[in-house]
């Protein structure tokens, strides 16, 4: 490959915009292929009791991997199998309960063609996505989804560009149509993304991160202010609960309450905690989502909340706990 000097006046931005325009035209053509064949493909995938197995070679394989990943994260159980590996044993992963999606822009992939007779013998439903309705794969398919584009964005017409974009979008169309048909929710999405921010917000509950047992700062209502301050210092949560031996809540005392005590003046050594506590305290139940507790704390401008069942203290949640858990 020759490495020539950059042509004088070459416009990178214009070249990029031309690609966008060509690919935009390709996607506009795709609209006509969302038809009865698309409906049939969706129905086969929706009614599949096994998994949706995606196959493709080369660039089609890269698109297929992304397609399978999108299906799997949006409620359609799916995985990718390389056609070459399938021909050497991995086809054993495919069962008659599955649906196979085979991708090839030309529709003449020899690796996939070698698998079709076996898939037919196993009675595995076959959906082929190609850019040529007259291709051998299109003719062999139970359902053919056409992704034909006017031309590739590559000026040589060689590098898959517009065609791979169209295939990717067709996969997204299938995934989202099925998502809507299944009534797939954000909570369902979070179950397959527990490590992400959305997963933490939609799965993590107060009971998962609250302080319990000896970690809870607490004194009884007969304690002095000094006793309460010592407990706050020991437990390092900036507050203490006032409760009886059975952990029935009487109130709460926070660093904000302490500032108000200073404003009162007088001899603080003589004060009982019952005189300066906030009765009751703001409470949440342990089963609520941590993000809901966060919203409550932010709306009430507080840094900690009691976790309780009625008047029975179960735990304490601090803003720092939410920060550590990645909810904030």
Swiss-Prot record:
Residue stretches making up the CBS domain: 210-268, 277-328
Pathway membership: Carbohydrate biosynthesis; 3-deoxy-D-manno-octulosonate biosynthesis; 3-deoxy-D-manno-octulosonate from D-ribulose 5-phosphate: step 1/3; Bacterial outer membrane biogenesis; lipopolysaccharide biosynthesis
Catalytic activity of the protein: D-arabinose 5-phosphate = D-ribulose 5-phosphate
Binding-site residues for Zn(2+), renumbered to this chain: 82
Record key words, sorted: Carbohydrate metabolism, CBS domain, Isomerase, Lipopolysaccharide biosynthesis, Metal-binding, Repeat, Zinc
Subunit structure of this chain's protein: Homotetramer.
Site feature (Catalytically relevant) residues: 59, 111, 152, 193
An individual GO BP term: lipopolysaccharide biosynthetic process
SIS domain residues: 41-184
Pfam families according to UniProt: CBS, SIS
Reported function: Involved in the biosynthesis of 3-deoxy-D-manno-octulosonate (KDO), a unique 8-carbon sugar component of lipopolysaccharides (LPSs). Catalyzes the reversible aldol-ketol isomerization between D-ribulose 5-phosphate (Ru5P) and D-arabinose 5-phosphate (A5P).
Residues binding substrate, per UniProt: 75-76, 82, 88, 114-123, 148-150, 275
Protein family per UniProt: Belongs to the SIS family. GutQ/KpsF subfamily.
Top class in the EC scheme: isomerase
Annotated S-S bridges: none
Protein name per UniProt: Arabinose 5-phosphate isomerase KdsD
InterPro entries to which the protein is assigned, alphabetical: CBS_dom, CBS_dom_sf, GutQ/KpsF_isomerases, KdsD/KpsF-type, SIS_dom, SIS_dom_sf, SIS_Kpsf
MF annotations from Gene Ontology: arabinose-5-phosphate isomerase activity; carbohydrate derivative binding; metal ion binding
Organism of origin: Salmonella typhimurium (strain LT2 / SGSC1412 / ATCC 700720)
EC number per UniProt: 5.3.1.13
Superkingdom, taxonomy of origin: Bacteria
């Amino acid at each position: 490959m020759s490495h020539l000097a950059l042509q004088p006046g070459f416009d990178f931005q214009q070249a990029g915009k031309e690609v966008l325009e060509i690919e935009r035209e390709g996607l506009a053509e795709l609209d006509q292929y969302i038809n009865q064949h698309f409906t049939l493909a969706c129905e086969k995938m929706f009614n599949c009791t096994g998994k949706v197995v995606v196959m493709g070679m080369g660039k089609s394989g890269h698109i297929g991997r992304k397609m399978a990943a999108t299906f799997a994260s949006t409620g359609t159980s799916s995985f990718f199998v390389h056609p070459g590996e399938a021909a050497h044993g991995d086809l054993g992963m495919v069962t008659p309960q599955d649906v196979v999606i085979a991708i090839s822009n030309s529709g003449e992939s020899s690796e996939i063609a070698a698998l079709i007779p076996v898939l037919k013998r196993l009675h595995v439903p076959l959906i082929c996505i190609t850019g040529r309705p007259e291709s051998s794969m299109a003719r062999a398919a139970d359902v053919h989804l056409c992704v034909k584009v006017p031309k590739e964005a590559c000026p040589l017409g060689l590098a898959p560009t517009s065609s791979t974009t169209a295939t990717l979008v067709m996969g997204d169309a299938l995934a989202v149509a099925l998502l809507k048909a299944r009534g797939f929710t954000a909570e369902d999405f979070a179950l397959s993304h527990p490590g992400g921010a959305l997963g933490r917000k939609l799965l993590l509950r107060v009971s998962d991160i609250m302080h319990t047992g000896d970690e809870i700062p607490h004194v009884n209502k007969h304690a002095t202010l000094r006793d309460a301050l010592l407990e706050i210092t020991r437990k390092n949560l900036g507050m203490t609960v006032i409760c009886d031996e059975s952990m029935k809540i009487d109130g709460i005392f926070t660093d904000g309450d302490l500032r108000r005590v200073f404003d009162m003046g007088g001899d603080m050594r003589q004060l009982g905690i019952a005189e300066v506590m906030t009765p009751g305290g703001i409470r949440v139940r342990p089963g609520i989502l941590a993000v809901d507790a966060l919203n409550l704390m932010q709306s009430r401008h507080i840094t900690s909340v009691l976790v309780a069942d009625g008047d029975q203290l179960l735990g304490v949640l601090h803003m720092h706990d939410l920060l550590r858990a990645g909810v904030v």
